[in-house]
UniProtKB/Swiss-Prot annotation:
Cross-referenced SUPFAM superfamilies: beta-beta-alpha zinc fingers, KRAB domain (Kruppel-associated box)
Primary role: May be involved in transcriptional regulation.
UniProt protein name: Putative zinc finger protein 705G
Species this protein is from: Homo sapiens (Human)
PROSITE patterns on file: KRAB, ZINC_FINGER_C2H2_1, ZINC_FINGER_C2H2_2
Length: 300
């Protein structure tokens, strides 16, 4: 095993052209900062020594007063063609908000005579994203987990395309838990689980609900109306859904299976509760103290 070389920030910098950087909105630039800091963190966890530079401090403080240029070859002498294959120039210079210059000079450039070589595969990596991806491939680490399905991902940048799998055709997305819906009505109804809002109240007992259908179902408990009956045991229910759920207990049928633990459930509520255990999601937050819970019953 080769000894792990000491790296600088420039060795792990993902590079963009000035035009690409200008086209990135605030969220994309934030994602870039997160990727850079995560790259550094993962390399340290793999045993690499990272020199802490001024640029890293800028990143940690959330500042964006610098730009990068794309890696390219600088060919000014045709006799040095073979040598230039090992020479890469990256512009890495601090700027001020008043700096609108688009020129790049040798004074503001960093020459890397040798690209990074992976100790496991021996592959030459000229881009920092390739460096980190290569190291994570050998280590087997997949540090990013999808909140929706629990799938582990190796690269932070790959989480964005993965999210689109879950949100495809669903243009209304919750900014708190990233759940997506096909229409704004369902999104507003979902947000009530975060805010605790319950606009539908029973006029008899004042119990409140997030949905009108839940209120109508509740009102039947006051009237005693139970139109759905189990033919095997004679048990009656307020809703047809409750009857169907009861009948599954006779059949021993468990339709909902967790792909993580293999545990099966006869009811979707039990399946959803089990799924939250794996993801660690706590979507129900107290408006007074901010404490969050995985189940709405714990919040109440």
């Amino acid at each position: 095993m080769h000894s792990l070389k000491k790296l600088t920030f420039e060795d792990v910098a993902i590079d963009f052209t000035q035009e690409e950087w200008a086209m990135m909105d605030t969220s994309k630039r934030k994602l870039y900062r997160d990727v850079m800091l995560e790259n550094i963190s993962h390399l340290v966890s793999l045993g690499y020594q990272i020199s802490k530079s001024y640029i890293i401090l800028q990143l940690e403080q959330g500042k964006e007063l610098w730009r990068e240029g794309r890696v390219f070859l600088q060919d000014q002498n045709p006799n040095r063609e073979s040598a230039l294959k090992k020479t890469h120039m990256i512009s890495m210079h601090p700027i001020t908000r008043k700096d609108a210059s688009t020129s790049m000079t040798m004074e503001n450039s960093l020459i890397l005579e040798d690209p990074f070589e992976c100790n496991d595969s021996g592959e030459d990596c000229t881009r920092s994203s390739t460096i980190t991806q290569c190291l994570l491939t050998h280590s087997g680490k997949k540090p990013y987990v999808s909140k929706q399905c629990g799938k582990s991902l190796r690269n932070l940048l790959s989480t964005e395309p993965h999210k689109q799998i879950h949100t495809k055709g669903k243009s209304y997305q919750c900014n708190l838990c990233e759940k997506a819906y096909t229409n704004c009505f369902h999104l507003r109804r979902h947000k009530m689980t975060h805010t605790g809002e319950r606009p539908y109240a029973c006029h008899l007992c004042r119990k409140a609900f997030t949905q009108c259908s839940h209120l109508r179902r509740h009102e039947k408990t006051h009237t005693g109306q139970r139109p759905y009956k189990c033919h095997q045991y004679g048990k009656v229910f307020i809703q047809s859904f409750n009857l169907q759920r009861h009948e599954r207990t006779h059949l021993g049928k468990k339709c909902y299976e967790c792909d993580k633990s293999g545990k099966a459930f006869s009811q979707s509520s039990g399946f959803r509760g089990n799924k939250i255990i794996h993801t660690g999601e706590k979507p129900h937050a107290c408006l007074l103290c901010g404490k969050a819970f995985s189940l709405s019953s714990n919040l109440r």
